Amino acid sequence: MELLQPSADAAPVPLPAFLDFTPNAAAKVAALIDAEGNPQLKLRLYVSGGGCSGFQYGFAFDDQVADDDLQVVTDGVTLLIDAMSRQYLAGARVDYEDGLEGSRFVIQNPNAQSTCGCGSSFSV
């Protein structure tokens, strides 16, 4: 995994690990991007207000990279994180699970003081 941040000359600069975007999650994202038929897509992970615990995670495909986005690259797949969401996601792990309870992306976040039962919202 490699974390990239745009620099003044637009060339990505490697940074220390900010977030663990697992190979399993990257493989699932790659399959979803392939199904969309647009290789320019990246997965955006963001935090917004809402959910039963105050904040909730969201995912969306995006073909645009904002100037202040962090780019976490694993196995050639890019995960984008906006500046506001960064403060809530430092040290988190983004994984993909496929088990008896179904398939889903799972975020293990050391910044979350509590989470809801479904795991899609949290408080800090």
Curated annotation (Swiss-Prot):
GO terms for biological process: iron-sulfur cluster assembly. InterPro entries: FeS_biogenesis, FeS_cluster_insertion, FeS_cluster_insertion_CS, FeS_cluster_insertion_RrpA, HesB-like_dom_sf. Keywords: Iron, Iron-sulfur, Metal-binding. GO terms for cellular component: cytosol. Coiled coil: none annotated. The keyword Transmembrane helix does not apply. It comes from the Bacteria. Its cofactor is iron-sulfur cluster. Required for insertion of 4Fe-4S clusters. HAMAP family: Fe_S_insert_ErpA. This is Putative iron-sulfur cluster insertion protein ErpA 2.
